């Protein structure tokens, strides 16, 4: 059977640790050791995801967001790392290194929009390139449809909520950066983008981007990042044919949208 360490080595090849931001905490964050025959890929490690992994007999969860980020001062039954150890489940978390990696979060996101002549921006994290000419409302609708089809469906409300600030300019050059990337609009402008598609952007990001001639689409943190879980699962299946790799069905957007 496959060991946790073997999967960790494979994940380091997929998302090299040197690509991570200095403030980040990627890696093998919970190591219960041993061998396993089943792995769960998820965006976040929540109590629901730990329960799912235990129910499905997964000895390891591979996630995007680190289950330990800030230094731990105490730990108890309500804390996810405690729950993982109690269940004997290890956790490998690849965060900003997976954002920047080839075939990682942002290349998966770019691929959804058939991006051509792809380049990096935002210190290698984001992707920018050519797409078929499209209006911002049309692009926002496509984002909502395509991302929803790749995410776990919520119990109530729509799967994806998209908002946009439209300059009225046709989008031919698109920049994408998943998650909380709204503050990077000036980096997108510097790369000649007509529009930045990200997960989260605040009020002032939208005002300033539009004033500077850049349209902005915010399609949700969860929605812009969850699609990478299927890509990671497929890479692990290729690397370990004997390993059953599942994509979490209980990892959902924490928000409910009206």
Segments from the language model and where they lie:
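Hydrophobic structural segments
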Residues: 1-258
């Amino acid at each position: 059977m496959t060991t946790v360490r073997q999967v960790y080595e494979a994940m380091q090849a997929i998302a090299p640790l040197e690509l991570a931001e200095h403030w980040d905490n990627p890696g093998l964050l919970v190591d219960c050791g041993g061998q396993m025959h089943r792995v769960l890929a998820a965006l976040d490690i929540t109590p629901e995801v730990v329960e799912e992994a235990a129910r499905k007999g997964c000895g390891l969860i591979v996630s995007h967001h680190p289950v330990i980020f800030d230094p731990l001062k105490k730990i108890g039954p309500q804390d996810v790392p405690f729950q993982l150890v109690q269940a004997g489940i290890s956790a490998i978390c690849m965060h900003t290194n997976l954002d920047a990696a080839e075939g990682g979060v942002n290349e998966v996101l770019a691929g959804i929009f058939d991006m051509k002549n792809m380049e990096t921006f935002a210190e290698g994290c984001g992707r920018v390139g050519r797409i078929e000419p499209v209006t911002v409302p049309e692009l926002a609708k496509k984002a909502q449809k395509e991302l929803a089809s790749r995410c776990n469906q919520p119990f109530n409300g729509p799967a994806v909520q998209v908002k946009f600030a439209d300059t009225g300019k046709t989008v031919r050059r698109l920049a994408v950066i998943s998650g909380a990337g709204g503050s990077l609009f000036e980096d997108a402008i510097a790369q000649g983008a007509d529009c930045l598609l990200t997960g989260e952007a605040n009020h002032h990001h939208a005002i300033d981007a539009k004033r500077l001639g850049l349209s902005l689409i915010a399609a949700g943190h969860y929605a812009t990042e969850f699609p990478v879980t299927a890509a990671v699962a497929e890479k692990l299946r290729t690397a370990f044919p004997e390993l059953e790799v599942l994509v979490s069905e209980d990892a959902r957007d924490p928000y409910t949208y009206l």
